[in-house]
Amino acid sequence: MSVGGKKMSRIEQEIHGIIDSLISDYDKDRPIDKMNNLGNQPDKEKITDIIDKLFKIMYPGYFRDRSHKVYDMRNYTTMLIEDVMYRLNQQIKTALRFSPENKEKEDTFFEDEAERLSVAFFKKIPEIRAYLNTDLQAAFDGDPAAYYKDEIILAYPGFYAITVNRIAHELFVLGVPMIPRIMTEHAHSLTGIDIHPGAIIGKYFFIDHGTGIVIGETTEIGEHVKIYQGVTCLLYTSDAA
């Protein structure tokens, strides 16, 4: 076999055969075959960056950029909020456009709804921080190996997963599509703790160790609850029961 007058080696022929087979497979019009998704879907890397910046807002004394000193907390917070709100707004807008139920909506809907949801989320941040403060206290009280609250914020995977979930839960409740799941699955990949953003979790929540914990969407957890590694809290389907 030759291409452009040049004889192909055996491995080149095999590669061309594989390519032909794959191109044919792409034409089957299945969900996994979509070609027009790039640029139209939420960006996981950008959402991860939003999480990192939200940690700077939730815990201003722990995750700030150390390359410069903050002389005016109000100015610093203003710049950070404006930056994160813009980035979140863009990702929410993309997620709304990507959702099948919105395919008939006008462009103005996506602009207005993304702005409304972004503002609504940021207004909830003081409430989220109030919950996180109780979670921090629960971890400190519940773990005799925790000598300082600082180490819980900086080092505990369970506290990281809880923080991400508190953020994602508010977005989920507001009706933001996809982004809450991307956030919690990012935390899951880092910590081994899988919390669905739809789960309802009360104050003073502590995850000890944490690896292998699964908390499903329908789960409701009250206040002052401590969960150890390897625990599953979810509703099984009748087929799985």
Residue ranges of predicted features:
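Conserved small/polar residues in nucleotide/adenosyl-binding loops
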Residues: 236-241
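Terminal amphipathic alpha-helical/low-complexity segments used for targeting or macromolecular assembly
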Residues: 1-182
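A structural motif detector for beta-strand N-caps
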Residues: 187, 193, 199-207, 211-213, ...
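A short glycine-/small-residue-rich loop at the edge of a beta-strand within enzyme catalytic domains
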Residues: 158, 174, 178, 196, ...
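Membrane-interfacial amphipathic helices and adjacent loop/beta segments
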Residues: 177-180, 184-193
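Double-stranded beta-helix
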Residues: 167, 185, 232-234
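Generic structural "secondary-structure junction" signal
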Residues: 154-156, 197, 235
